[in-house]
Amino acid sequence: MQRRPLIETVHGIRREAFGPQEWGLLASIAAMWGASFLFIEIGLEHFGPGLVAFGRVGIGAITLALLPRSHAPVDRADLPRIALLGFVWMAAPLLLFPIGQQWIDSSLAGMINGAVPVFAAVIAAILLRRRPGRRQLLGIAIGFVGVICVFWPATRGAEATVLGAGLVLLAVVFYGLAVNLAVPLQQRYGALPVLFRAQLVALVLLAPAALVSLPSSEFAWSSALAVMALGFFGTGWAFVAMTTLVGRVGATRGSVAIYFLPVVAIALGVVFRDETVASISLIGTGLVLAGAYLTSRRE
């Protein structure tokens, strides 16, 4: 039997324009992940970054464990790929976000997250050896300009702000790789078995970070409830919806769901945290929405 490479990706099964199911998945992803940045900020009020990351993955794994399909068998030959996903999709980015958000607002973190489709498209082109179509390239370019506008105010701030924004951007790079690697696995087994096992791997990897965070953490219901919501929605149901969307439309177009996160993140940050957003960041948000529309059209 021919051995599959450790790193592989494929196209989605749906090549035409988004339909009602795809847009519904996209909206739910944007709502759940857009709120995640607010939940992280609330969690950081009393918990260290490692504990926030470990807690959200733990709750997410418990959520998926309750679904029978999560326990469906997978080929042992694919376990190394799932373990790799546990690092690049779960452990690394989910730890980098709370570390970075110690120095930046939740709305800024959400807006930077809009860069995922840019990296997803570049990595997909490399792995698939296929360049995106003209419409997708235009959408990616417009979205990339929008992300630069969103990121620009952070470059004018203190060094800690730049560091925090940079760590969040690094997490986004991991996401760009992960959405590509997840496609063949989720098409082979479905979303739940892959996600559940990847989260179990991430729990092991994040355990040392959680232990390091314990001395600087104290229990508070506000932070505990935020982490619970973060795990149930942001690490449970949102990942299921995302892998379902990516499996249907491919990594490049599926990742456009990330374009809509800034809208939710900005609204929640302004309403609940009294955060301020620079005008250029709002312009950038409009650009990434335009890029999302173009990228989601027929290839």
Model-predicted segments: where are they?
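Specific alpha-helical transmembrane segments that line the substrate/conduction pathway
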Residues: 51-62, 89, 94-131, 135-136, ...
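Hydrophobic/small/kink-forming positions within alpha-helical transmembrane segments
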Residues: 34, 38, 65, 86-91, ...
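Specific transmembrane alpha-helical segments of multi-pass solute transporters/efflux pumps
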Residues: 31-40, 65-113, 149, 231-249
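Hydrophobic transmembrane alpha-helices of multi-pass small-molecule transport proteins
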Residues: 7, 58, 64, 123, ...
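Juxtamembrane helix-entry segments on the extracytoplasmic side of multipass membrane proteins
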Residues: 18-23, 45-50, 54, 74-80, ...
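Transmembrane alpha-helical segments that form core, pore/gating elements
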Residues: 61-64, 120-122, 126, 140, ...
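Helix-helix packing/entry segments at the starts of transmembrane helices
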Residues: 54-55, 90, 109-115, 179-204, ...
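Glycine-/small-residue-enriched transmembrane alpha-helix faces in small-molecule transporters
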Residues: 2-54, 99, 157-184
